[in-house]
């Protein structure tokens, strides 16, 4: 492993071992972006690719030099630009829809921020021996939110975690929650990835209208990691006070709560935010200059030209045009 908490000596030793072939697989955080080259890498896997910008992903691949490694990008919810490129045939696309055994769909609700809603959700989870996440994404007010929850639900063991805490303190709080010595973890969105706590099966996301679809889907995925029914509450102000785009995001995440719904959520995100700039760095946004139809026509022509010239050998066994599909329906309707 290679991460920011390693000493310089240990980082250098790890990279030396990978360069000489003593290590076959190197697992790294984004610390690999700075001052590290991997010229002998033949395969690169980028997890949670929606957390990276276009330039970051390009820079990671360039670290392999002229080796041009195979690149596998993995994400629960592809960003609009990446998804659009896959749908257009620029990149190959594989979808994993089969969930782990015994998993159940997460029940998702849009709810107001009031004492009755919060206490009912928390008490239900604690009564069945579980634990609760409460997400509040403003560090300045997070202690006050934890105090308010303590007033509404007295006697509970509540911990607070956010990115501005010292690393050892945050690690201590997270370990206490994992070990079950805390009932509720009030945290910012730092919990949206990397936590697998089967006993935590209720999450309340405060001010959910301020999050993107990918963030909401990732945070909802912190619960429902066992064979118990899990619940996600999107805590928002009155819907009439929200923007149209915020309402569409909330409706999308509420409607697509079934297992394996990440791809459908990504499609809705593409519809809401637009496909972005395929020739630049913008990862979302609408085509306003030339229009979508003309842009798609130009893109199709460019792809066809590359597949018949520079990359002809690579696509020699694949047809230029997608196969036509004929569907016959047997009905009793009159002709």
Which positions does each model-derived feature cover?
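C-terminal helicase module of SF1/SF2 nucleic-acid helicases/translocases
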Residues: 1-26, 31-38, 43-55, 73, ...
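Post-DEXD/H (motif II) to motif III coupling segment of the RecA-like Helicase ATP-binding lobe
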Residues: 51-131
């Amino acid at each position: 492993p290679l991460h920011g908490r390693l000493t310089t000596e240990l980082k250098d030793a790890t990279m030396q071992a990978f360069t000489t072939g003593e290590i076959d697989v190197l697992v790294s955080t984004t610390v690999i972006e700075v001052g590290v080259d991997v010229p002998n890498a033949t395969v690169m896997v980028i997890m949670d690719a929606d957390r990276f910008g276009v330039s970051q992903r390009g820079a990671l691949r360039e670290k392999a030099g002229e080796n041009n490694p195979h690149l596998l990008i993995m994400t629960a919810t592809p960003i609009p630009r990446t998804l659009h490129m896959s749908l257009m045939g620029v990149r190959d696309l594989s979808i994993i829809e089969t969930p782990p055994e015994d998993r159940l769909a997460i029940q998702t609700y849009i709810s107001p921020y009031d004492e009755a809603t919060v206490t009912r959700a928390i008490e239900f989870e604690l009564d069945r021996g579980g634990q609760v996440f409460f997400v509040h994404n403003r560090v300045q007010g997070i202690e006050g939110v934890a105090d308010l929850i303590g007033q509404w639900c007295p006697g509970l063991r509540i911990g607070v975690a956010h990115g501005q805490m010292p690393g050892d303190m945050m690690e201590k709080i997270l370990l206490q929650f994992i070990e079950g010595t805390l009932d509720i973890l009030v945290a910012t969105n730092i919990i949206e990835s990397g936590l697998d706590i089967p006993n935590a099966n209720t999450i309340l996301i405060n001010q959910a209208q301020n999050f993107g679809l990918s963030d909401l889907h990732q945070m909802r995925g912190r619960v429902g990691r066992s064979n118990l029914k899990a619940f996600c509450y999107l805590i928002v102000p009155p819907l009439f006070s929200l923007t149209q785009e915020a309402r569409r995001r909330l409706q999308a995440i509420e409607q697509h709560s079934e297992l394996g719904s990440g791809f459908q959520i990504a499609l809705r995100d593409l519809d809401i935010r637009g496909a972005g700039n395929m020739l630049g760095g913008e990862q979302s946004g609408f085509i306003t200059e030339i229009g979508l139809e003309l842009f798609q026509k130009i893109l199709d022509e460019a792809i066809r030209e590359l597949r018949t010239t520079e990359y002809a050998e690579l696509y020699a066994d694949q047809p230029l045009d997608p196969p036509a599909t004929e569907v016959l329906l047997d009905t009793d309707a009159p002709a």
